[in-house]
């Protein structure tokens, strides 16, 4: 079947438009006082609200997929389910939406790391969407969204200058645990799989290269997280205060 006629395109378009519509709805919600006076923080707040919603839905969805099809934990290349396939399409639609949102809002320079991540994620997901291979790997990758629930909540509190409240202090420890369980652990497991098996195949080699680049990004983000929450500077500079854009 020609790629342009693939039935997955309506699913991707529908998911992308869903997130676009969601953003319009969320933009009507009241803004926190520390956010509404700054256009950059306002855009970032709305962007994070969409991300937060995606993380909740996709994180729970990924856990449900693995519960329904546990062989995805082992048969990473061949395991397939309707639930998992729709999840990968849904999340790919989010990454398309967020990429367009960043570019249209002229936040490319401030959010270039997100763009790099989104391009790599979409490249990996498309192998499952258009060739129906490694759908299980895509679902395992999306376990990271469970961690992103707490990571996004952390960033939203930082934007709102709420680092001193109890919720932030509790969340930073929960966030650390979730980072290990749902980000570092699945990523290490997938990397081991692709190094041993899939790296010998053409598509597997492509996905392995993406995975290794994501490994580097995840470790960099982890070091930033530790430094920001557990080894903060006493008198942060203006540049440090604005790091909510990438941290």
Curated annotation (Swiss-Prot):
It holds the Pfam family TRAM_LAG1_CLN8. Residues 28-46, 105-123, 145-173, 223-247 are extracellular. It is found in: Cell membrane. Residues 68-83, 195-201 are cytoplasmic. One of its GO terms (cellular component) is plasma membrane. GO terms for biological process: membrane assembly; phospholipid homeostasis; plasma membrane organization; regulation of membrane lipid distribution. It is a multi-pass membrane protein. It comes from the Eukaryota. Regulates the composition and fluidity of the plasma membrane. Inhibits the incorporation of membrane-fluidizing phospholipids containing omega-3 long-chain polyunsaturated fatty acids (LCPUFA) and thereby promotes membrane rigidity. Does not appear to have any effect on LCPUFA synthesis. This is TLC domain-containing protein 1. It comes from Rattus norvegicus.
